[in-house]
Amino acid sequence: GKMYGRATAVSKCDFTTFAFAVRALEAVAKPTRGQIELHFTYDEEFGGDLGPGWLLSKGLTQPDLMVAAGFSYQVVTAHNGCLQLEVTVQGEMAHAAIPDSGIDALQGATHILQALYRLNANYLKIKSKVEGISHPYLNVGQISGGTNTNVVPGKVVFKVDRRMIPEENPAEVEAALRQTISDAAASFQPPRGGKALKVDVRRMLLANAMVPLAGNQPLVQAIQKHGGEVFGEPIPALGTPLYTDVRLYVERGIPGVIYGAGPRTVLESHAKRADERIDLQDLRRATKVMARVLADLMSA
């Protein structure tokens, strides 16, 4: 059967995967060495600084290895970074009957958006060497503005999400985006003349890409061994275009990977949709894999 609901696959299911894997160890294979910590945090999509970032910065956790919530058919060892910007385009509001007296912020924002979207054609030419990760890309996920139908919009705000492959330099990516926005704003010519646009760019999030550490091999090998046995097929080590909290551990020299319950792809999970789902058989099998992995690592 399947279980449906928002966050079922990303990542409530792994609360169960990890918790019941630990319970299995307690019941039938108590560890002879080491300790296990379960970190249930909720701020990954906002950078992770209030959850794992806070725990790490305060020295409240110092693990040797870590596994974060993921899917069942691959073990993820690298992932994209993410830059999010909020762009405020300020024009001058006016009555629609006398549009010449204002500056249309929406037209200006549209001009800037066209310049940003054109970047995606260039990003297609930039290829990552990490299997599972293709190229950078840009998305505008939210836009708001205007006050009424009969009013020339005086202000428009939109939010940009720029995914960065591991080979990219985040500072250079941000500088290039800001320059594109600035150049587009400067080149905008209001159809009826008028003042120039005022544009403000604010960074909302900068999450670095994750690159694998050599010390992750015990985790990778154990997951591939037991995953292959339980699922009956090879479990490859790949990168993912997502960004996660794992980078916060890896940036502090703690080897980490991503593995858990779920389908082969994010698309199959219907993540972020009302019909997000997980196959319960994947949940059961991933829990078995994690229990075996922990048993190996804690008894070696």
Q: Where are the model-predicted features located?
A:
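Residue-level preference for short coil/turn positions at secondary-structure junctions
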Residues: 4-5, 32, 62, 154, ...
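Acidic/histidine-rich catalytic neighborhood of metal-dependent amide-processing enzymes
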Residues: 11-84, 298-299
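Metal-dependent amide/peptide-bond hydrolase catalytic core
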Residues: 71, 76-78, 83-300
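Catalytic-core environment of secreted peptidases
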Residues: 1-9, 67
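Structural motif
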Residues: 6, 39-41, 238-240
